[in-house]
Amino acid sequence: MFDKAERSSFKYWFAHWRSFNMVALNQKCWKFKYLFHDMEKPFLNLILPYKTLQKFHRFHNKHHSEYYFLQLGKYHKCDNYDYEATIIDLECSHYTKTNCPRNAKQEVDTQYLIYKNNESKYVKQIVEKYSDYFNEIIDENGNSRYIIILVEKFYQNLYEKLKKIGLN
């Protein structure tokens, strides 16, 4: 198990990579592309500070919600989001991270509850983070029914994938 300070190490990346592929194999949803999961991280870690690397990774990989919302903001759609890899990533986290005791289902439930309890705050954070892209769909109060629908769809798809993989 690794704590936050150790996550920039090659040792952590390799443990995460093995865990990710192990979960995919155990759930019978492994794909060849999973051999390349987070493959850029150890190389970029040689030239970038970890925080910069982490941000770059999350905005450029199809299994992170940051990628999903950036694509929605830019193109008003995200047809290529990898829900399955997201679920596998969430599931394998509790094998490698000390501060992630929850499995994928518990993590999705927790994140969805945070969203439902603070819907307007959650949407506001998305709008602020991606303000360059979402300006035209926000009303004068800073709200957007469109974003709420997209967030609901995002969680609905995560729950469907949890069920399909067998982690519900």
Kindly label every feature range from the protein language model.
Residues M1-N168:
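Metal-dependent phosphohydrolase cores
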